[in-house]
């Protein structure tokens, strides 16, 4: 999953912002319904989880069409164990309540950005994502003329975790093409 914030989207710069940009299932114009659903899920355990098993149960309830993994070690990428022994998301859902999480601010920043026509940009989209829909993709395409899109079938918002091989292949192909290795 990705975050898009004021710190990661400078509006203008005399120098190139970056040689390339990869957005992982994030667009400035989010599906508000989907974002609300994700926010509700992420905020449903404000005190964290007593165990990885409890977290896996919550994730399985949110994604009923996915098989519950037998090996829960992958959850270590998304959860952190606190001093109290409870497991909490590494991403703080309160971020969406901050000014930087305001979707209107993100759209305004994109409108003011001057790099969008010169920085090669790839959107890696999970086709089962709750927060990136066709409207958001088309809005981003209008704002970033050279936008490339890698649609990852069967992946939700956590694209890299859902379909890691396809995610890696899309990102590596894009970066190798737009930023070929030297020598």
Where are the language model's segments positioned?
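Flexible "cap/lid" loop of the alpha/beta hydrolase fold
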Residues: 2, 12-53
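Glycosyltransferase donor-binding loop in the core domain
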Residues: 47, 129, 156-159
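Conserved alpha/beta-hydrolase catalytic His-Asp/Glu region
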Residues: 48-107
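Residue-level signal for the nucleotide or nucleotide-sugar donor/cofactor binding architecture
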Residues: 50, 132, 162
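Catalytic active-site module of serine/aspartate enzymes centered on a nucleophile-bearing elbow/loop
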Residues: 145-183
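Conserved serine/cysteine hydrolase catalytic core
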Residues: 81-143, 148-151
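Alpha-helical elements of Rossmann-like donor-binding domains used by nucleotide-donor carbohydrate transfer enzymes
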Residues: 54, 58, 74, 135, ...
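Active-site loop/turn elements of alpha/beta-hydrolase fold enzymes
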Residues: 23-26, 128, 152-154
């Amino acid at each position: 999953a990705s975050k898009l914030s004021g710190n990661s989207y400078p509006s203008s710069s005399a120098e190139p912002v970056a040689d390339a940009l990869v957005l992982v299932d994030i667009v400035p114009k989010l599906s508000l319904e989907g974002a609300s659903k994700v926010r509700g899920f992420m905020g449903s355990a404000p005190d964290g989880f007593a165990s990885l098993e409890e977290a896996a149960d919550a994730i399985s309830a949110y994604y009923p069409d996915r098989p519950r993994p037998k090996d829960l070690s992958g959850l270590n990428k998304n959860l952190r164990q606190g001093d109290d022994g409870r497991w909490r998301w590494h991403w703080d859902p309160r971020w969406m309540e901050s000014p930087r999480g305001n979707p209107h601010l993100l759209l305004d920043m994109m409108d003011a950005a001057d790099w969008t026509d010169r920085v090669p940009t790839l959107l890696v989209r999970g086709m089962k994502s709750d927060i990136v829909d066709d409207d958001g993709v088309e809005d981003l395409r209008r704002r970033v003329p050279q936008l490339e899109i890698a649609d990852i079938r069967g992946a939700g918002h956590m694209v890299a975790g859902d379909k890691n091989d396809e995610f890696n292949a899309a990102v590596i192909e894009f970066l190798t093409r737009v930023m070929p290795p030297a020598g």
